[in-house]
Amino acid sequence: MATKKTIEKATTKPVKAATKTTATKATKATKEPKTVPVEKIQEIADQAAQAQTPAAPAPGQVQVNVDFLKTTKVHIAMPCYGGMLTESTFMSFIKWANTARQLGIDWTLETMVNESLISRARNTLTAKFLDMPDATHLFFVDADIGWEPWHLLVLLNRDVDVIGGLYPMKTMPIKWVVNGFEGAEEGPDGLQEVSKAGTGFLLMKKHVFEKLKSHPAVKQYKNDIGLDPKFDQHLKTYFDTAVRQNRYYSEDWTFCENWRDIGGKIWMDKRVLLRHSGSYVFCMENQEHLMKTVGPMFLQEQQEKFGIKFTDKDGNEIKKITAA
């Protein structure tokens, strides 16, 4: 799925004779990097999916360095249990493919179906990525995450070792799949250091895994699932569950802890707000819970921020939301 780059042949033009002076010596001009505003990227993406609503408005005054992006090759890895993915994720890839083609950005995609053990799925996908000599970044995205092309492009443009975007847990009120910590470093334009980030939308440079080999928790394991033997050398427990501080950690939390153990940093771009699709059971009990927890906060926020008044079907103002 990699894009083909067009190479233009250099042409030689005749140069008119000119009087030589010391003041008119030829100098090599410094080439300015090509940049594209994220609004333009969103416009390109929407050409492929007019009906899809963006996950979040594209931030103004933000440029991505396309010349830099062309020096990268991101390998997108998606665990896809049962071969299923959501409509939101499908539309995201349609947009991404169209945008990457028009910008001339190289990328590849690997999915894994019917692997019920998510930690082994991630380690297998990582092993295949590490066997690709020209791939520079591994990008994990889950099959239930909705995203925009500019989300991935701004993460690549950050040029840090490990960085993710914000996606909600499948709960209301919204809680984000991320953990902060006291004294965390802050960078420009919404860049924030965190202690843990979910692998549902996480970008990692290749050398991260080379460095993680030194961590005692990262161990080689046997290829007993029928993979090509060429991947054997890369089969390591980069993503595994663990018990730390008397807590049971998922494979993404453990990855983050191991990386920070050896001096690495986990970053989050707070501009990258994503969609997390899931099912919901519609019943009276859930309605009561939702109205009690979310309803009052939503009503108060909308009234305070925007002066919005909510009315019932008879036109009477609703000043308080209660469960039916």
Predicted regions and their residues:
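N-proximal low-complexity "stem/linker" segments adjacent to membrane-targeting elements
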Residues: 38-116
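Short beta-strand-to-loop acidic/aromatic patch adjacent to the donor-nucleotide binding site
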Residues: 135-146
